[in-house]
């Protein structure tokens, strides 16, 4: 149950800008090693990233059990942040999160972006269609879709909050203000912003003929 809650917390932290603003500093490094694992959010607790675990309390799980299990999950995820381990046995790769799967999660390549949200297990990603395997033909390119050129920890931790405030000042309606805050990162009023969905759709359109375009993915809009 903890891992199920973690999956939805982690997915929301990528698909909702309000939570992404807290989570982004974990992904801002263009290098991938064990030190990446300790680049943790400063503002997550303040913006309610604990909410996906609250239903477990309502179901009767003691809070101390939830905290303990969440701690075990974070310990497990520490060793995933490495390029030194290529692949593990196939059965393990199928069931569990591994360095290979988590490299994909940290990659900004269009084919990899916003994939593999699971903490310990990969079954949730396979079930909900967010799984992607690492390809030997395309090395992972780590970092953000638009990287920030600074090592200042304050700017790294708060740059997305600043960008959100700037976008809110330019909002022309409550709908725009809502989407700038709670929509996907990169959302723009014209629908052509660099969201993960648009980036993936453009990539798919470049490699598949129009007639073979997957129906489950919305084609990119033309300017």
Where are these regions (language model features)?
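Membrane-embedded catalytic scaffold of the fatty acid hydroxylase/desaturase
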Residues: 1-142
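Cytosolic-facing loops and C-terminal tails of multi-pass membrane proteins
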Residues: 138-223
């Amino acid at each position: 149950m903890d891992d199920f809650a973690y999956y939805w917390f982690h997915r929301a932290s990528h698909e909702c800008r309000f939570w992404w603003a807290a989570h982004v500093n974990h992904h801002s490094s263009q290098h991938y090693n064990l030190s990446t694992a300790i680049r943790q959010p400063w503002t997550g607790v303040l913006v309610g990233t604990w909410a996906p675990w609250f239903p477990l309390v309502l179901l009767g799980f003691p809070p101390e059990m939830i905290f303990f299990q969440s701690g075990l999950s974070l310990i497990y995820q520490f060793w995933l942040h490495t390029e030194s381990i290529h692949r593990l046995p196939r059965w393990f790769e199928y069931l569990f999160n591994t360095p290979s799967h988590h490299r994909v999660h940290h990659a900004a390549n269009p084919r990899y972006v916003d994939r593999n949200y699971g903490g310990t297990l990969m079954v949730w990603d396979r079930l909900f269609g967010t799984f992607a395997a690492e390809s030997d033909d395309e090395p992972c390119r780590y970092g953000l879709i638009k990287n920030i050129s600074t090592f200042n920890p304050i700017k790294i931790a708060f740059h997305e909050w600043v960008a959100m405030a700037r976008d809110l000042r330019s909002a022309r309606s409550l709908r725009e203000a809502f989407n700038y805050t709670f929509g996907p990162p990169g959302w723009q009023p014209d629908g052509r912003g660099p969201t993960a969905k648009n980036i993936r759709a453009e990539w798919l359109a470049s490699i598949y003929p129009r007639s073979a375009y997957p129906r489950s993915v919305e084609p990119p809009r033309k300017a």
